[in-house]
Amino acid sequence: MKSSVPSLLFVSLVMSLNSYTQQVLYCPPDPAPENITEFVCNSPSLHEFPTGFPVRTKIISVEFTQVSSLGVEALQGLPNLQELHLSNNRLKTLPSGLFRNLPELHTLDLSTNLLEDLPPEIFTSTTSLTLLSISENRLAKLRLSWFETLKELRILSLDNNQLKEVPISCFDKLEKLTFLDLSSNHLHRLSPDMFSGLDNLERLSLENNPIRCIAPKSFHGRPKLSIISLKNCSLTNIITGVFQPLNHXVLLDLSDNELTMLDPPVAIPSANLSLDLTGNPWACNCRMDNLLTWVKEHKIDLYSKQEIVCAFPKSFKGEEATSLHRSQICPC
């Protein structure tokens, strides 16, 4: 099974941001030793959010518990808190002022909970955030107000929710964002407004969405975008030139869609572009020949060539497309 490159990148980025050197103590003892600044509370039987964290606390991990709510004062008196990990709990909602007075907070993980919505002003005070994960929840919509003050954010993970659309200009203020994960939602189309403001975006994961339409200029204005995953997105057709601005792309994953034909994605690709076309029902005709000629001329790295097989015409069904001679698929 092929690994999801964007997902692996997200894991590596999280790990790099969370390389701890301080001693870890499990849950806050009373009193806590002077040299302890990180606390891990991950008992499966824990139902209430712990209290008594010392003012010097920098990292709190309350994960894999039965905690379903936090009081609005739960994090007050912790001005040095830098990382808060609340994944794999039973959280259904969060109070509006929960994250106030946390000027040093740069990492917030709310993944794998039961969140269906969040208060409009929930992140207003978290202006130092560089990583925010709300993946694997039940969000059906995004609020513009969530992202208005997150100008330092680099990594945003919204995968595995129930999002059907991204509001116009939703990410406008995220000028420093480099990685955006919207995979495994219910998005049906991409439009230019969806990614407006993301001038520094480098990695974009959209896999496992029922995307059938990519509007022209959807990727315009993203000069640094280098990795795009559109794997398993129900794509049947891609408009010529939609990827044209991506001259710096190093990975374009179009695997496991319903594509039968594809024009060369970019006229002048980057020197190290990799392209995944596996798992599509390709029509092996002159248009496919043009694509393969482009691949050969620009020395594009094709993933798993043996899995790029013809579905049409019947005479070539099951044949490896790259093994066919030009005279066979385009005799004219």
UniProtKB/Swiss-Prot annotation:
Residues 1-23 form the signal peptide. This is Phospholipase A2 inhibitor beta. Keywords: Glycoprotein, Leucine-rich repeat, Phospholipase A2 inhibitor, Repeat, Secreted, Signal. Inhibits the enzymatic activity of the basic phospholipase A2 (PLA2). LRR repeats lie at residues 78-101, 103-125, 127-149, 150-173, 175-197, 198-221, 223-245, 247-269. One of its GO terms (molecular function) is phospholipase A2 inhibitor activity. It comes from the Eukaryota. Homotrimer. It comes from Elaphe climacophora (Japanese rat snake). PROSITE patterns: LRR. Belongs to the beta-type phospholipase A2 inhibitor family. Concentration of this protein in the serum is 8-fold lower than in the E.quadrivirgata (another non-venomous snake) serum. This difference may reflect the difference in the food habits of these snakes. E.quadrivirgata preys upon snakes including the venomous snakes, whereas E.climacophora only preys upon small mammals and birds. The keyword Metal-binding does not apply. PANTHER family: IG(IMMUNOGLOBULIN) AND LRR(LEUCINE RICH REPEAT) DOMAINS (PTHR24366), LEUCINE RICH REPEAT CONTAINING 53 (PTHR24366:SF96). Pfam families: LRR_1, LRR_8. InterPro entries: Cys-rich_flank_reg_C, Leu-rich_rpt, Leu-rich_rpt_typical-subtyp, LRR_dom_sf. Glycans are attached at residues 35, 232, 272. One of its GO terms (cellular component) is extracellular region. Residues 280-331 form the LRRCT domain. Its main location: secreted. It is found in: Secreted. SMART domains: LRR_BAC, LRR_SD22, LRR_TYP, LRRCT.
